[in-house]
Amino acid sequence: MSTKRTYQPKKRHRSRVHGFMKRMATSNGRKVLARRRAKGRKVLSA
């Protein structure tokens, strides 16, 4: 028995866990976005 790869990408899971709406939903998430804007990130969230 071998162990499986732990990263099994799914678009829905990615956006629900790390997406923009999820970030905007909490005050800490908004802080994350503010930090990334201040740093000049091209992509703010998944």
Curated annotation (Swiss-Prot):
GO terms classed as biological process: translation
Gene Ontology molecular function: any one: structural constituent of ribosome
Domain of life according to the entry: Bacteria
Basic residues biased stretches: 32-46
Disordered, as annotated region: 26-46
GO cellular component term, pick one: ribosome
InterPro entries with a match to the protein in the record: Ribosomal_bL34, Ribosomal_bL34_CS
Keyword annotations: Ribonucleoprotein, Ribosomal protein
PANTHER family per record: LARGE RIBOSOMAL SUBUNIT PROTEIN BL34M, MITOCHONDRIAL RIBOSOMAL PROTEIN 34 FAMILY MEMBER
NCBIfam families (alphabetical): rpmH_bact
Protein name, UniProt field: Large ribosomal subunit protein bL34
Native source species: Lactobacillus delbrueckii subsp. bulgaricus (strain ATCC 11842 / DSM 20081 / BCRC 10696 / JCM 1002 / NBRC 13953 / NCIMB 11778 / NCTC 12712 / WDCM 00102 / Lb 14)
